[in-house]
From Swiss-Prot:
Active site: H47
PANTHER family documented for this protein: 3-HYDROXYACYL-[ACYL-CARRIER-PROTEIN] DEHYDRATASE (PTHR30272:SF1)
EC number(s) per entry: 4.2.1.59
Species, as recorded: Streptococcus pneumoniae (strain Hungary19A-6)
Protein name in the entry: 3-hydroxyacyl-[acyl-carrier-protein] dehydratase FabZ
Recorded name of the encoding gene: fabZ
Role played: Involved in unsaturated fatty acids biosynthesis. Catalyzes the dehydration of short chain beta-hydroxyacyl-ACPs and long chain saturated and unsaturated beta-hydroxyacyl-ACPs.
Gene Ontology molecular function: (3R)-hydroxyacyl-[acyl-carrier-protein] dehydratase activity
Family note: Belongs to the thioester dehydratase family. FabZ subfamily.
């Protein structure tokens, strides 16, 4: 398990863009983390005031950050950054609303040099909320 302090050591993101609260499981190529979604999230002020829904692009960002924690926690990547290089096969299946807990899983399926491909999914109450294939570049 990695707490918020460990996450902040791995990722450069800070409020309001830090979207990973805790890491539950870590292995060589897979990480499982959570994001507790509250009504206090700044994006709910405008998306949508009468019916708050977490923007899908921020769910994908949370998944990217989850993968980033795994990659940037490795000694050889200390102090580096992870940049989006692409997203494929992204699907949104369930709305994410205040009070939900996103359980995010990211599995690295391919690495070549500084490029990595990740299969990622976010679930709420065991139901798929979003999924996709994310491509990253690791750099300074």
């Amino acid at each position: 398990m990695i707490d918020i302090q460990g996450i902040k050591e791995a990722l450069p993101h800070r409020y309001p863009m830090l979207l990973v609260d805790r890491v539950l499981e870590v292995s060589e190529d897979t990480i499982v983390a959570i994001k507790n979604v509250t009504i206090n999230e700044p994006f709910f002020n405008g998306h949508f005031p009468q019916y708050p829904v977490m923007p899908g692009v921020l769910i994908m960002e949370a998944l990217a950050q989850t993968a980033g924690v795994l990659e940037l926690s490795k000694p050889e990547n200390k102090g580096k950054l992870v940049f989006y290089a692409g997203m494929d096969k992204v699907k949104f299946k369930k709305q994410v609303v205040p009070g939900d807990q996103l359980v995010m899983t990211a599995t690295f399926v391919k690495r070549r040099g500084t490029i990595a491909v990740v299969e990622a999914k976010a679930e709420v109450d065991g139901k798929l909320a979003a999924s996709g294939t994310l491509t990253f570049a690791i750099g300074n």
